[in-house]
Amino acid sequence: MFINEQFVLANKRKCAYNARIRTKKENYNETSKQKSEMSTRELAAYIDYSVLKPEFTPEQIVELTKDGVELGCATICINPGYMDLCKPYIKGSETKLCPVCDFPFGTSSTESKVAQAKILIDGYADVIGELDIVANFGKIRAGLYEEVTADIKAVVDTCHAKNVPVKVIFETDALNEEQIRKTCHCCIDAGADFVKSSTGFLTGFEAHGATVEVIKMMQEEVGDKCKVKGSGCIRTREHFLELIDMGIDRMGVGYRSVPVVLDLQR
């Protein structure tokens, strides 16, 4: 009986993954463009330009924000304290700001997360594109999935009241396969818009980030119920294009790696 249940579950995952890839390929066919034919700007639209390092000076943050806007990145992912600094450089562009919430640990109280999210979506409605929050991966490791779901849902409900999409970071390098798969369903149940692999700031574990295996695992679990963002260790053009081939929706890429994945000569 157990073997049959495992077979059925594996088959469902495979079907969900195949359906997702089929839909993506149909969309590619509609535009009659392969990734190799896509312009730099079209490829940049997959990118959340990560400007999160705590040692960045305000001047560096402004320069990197301007760079991301010029390239046409989907968002500039920044720490909340720099929203006012970056806001003038976003207005009138296709690029939006994506602040992080309770980053990078996800260990604050639910009330604290909701309060931070509310400040951001109320104060920056004209420039905020999405909000990235960190799931409490210590509780995930402990198997406290109901608490994890409730925590995520509180922030998601707050953001959705103002039509702001939410991405949920798992920190997959700290989790095993079962934990990753179950957390995908926590996010679906909470109404999240994206599942996301990594913060890029985890210590004490080997850094693998958005591997093909992890992204496929997430895609299998969420199907068409949620989008998938890969983040962490996307540093080569080959990896970047491979994830696009897999049907990924978004990628978080650091400032040093953006020129590499976009094949820019600087």
Model-found features: residue ranges?
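Short, positively charged and aromatic/hydrophobic N-terminal segments
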Residues: 6, 10, 16-20, 24
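Conserved N-terminal beta1-alpha1 strand-loop-helix module at the mouth
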Residues: 30-118, 122-125, 186
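Catalytic cores of alpha/beta
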Residues: 110-119, 175-186, 234-248
